[in-house]
């Protein structure tokens, strides 16, 4: 079962406009898919790996601890129903394949990722001290933007 919600509380942040968190709504991304793409993705499960193409967190932990972390793998539906809405539930950083296996896996992954992060689905949160953000992990992609300086955040994830 995927984690449901994440809460992030900022305690120390760089200057406003630096160290933002970028969010992409996967409800809107799903709604904007063509009917044929909705059908295609609904018939597939994603194969995910903690050693995926942009597993930055894993690489940082290995660097800190000096030892390899065991790879975690999972599969789940790419299109997920949440209450009465549908969302794309796929992590560009960890998707490594599809079940059943398909031709042109790389092409479909690229097309899906490009669609998921379209500007019209995005919001950039400019952190201020003691600000709280809460989001649904099942329907929202998120990533920190690169920055210089220090940032202290307290994070809680609800399973």
Question: PLM ranges: what are they?
Answer:
Residues 1-129, 137-159:
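Non-heme Fe(II) oxygenase catalytic core, chiefly the N-lobe of the double-stranded beta-helix
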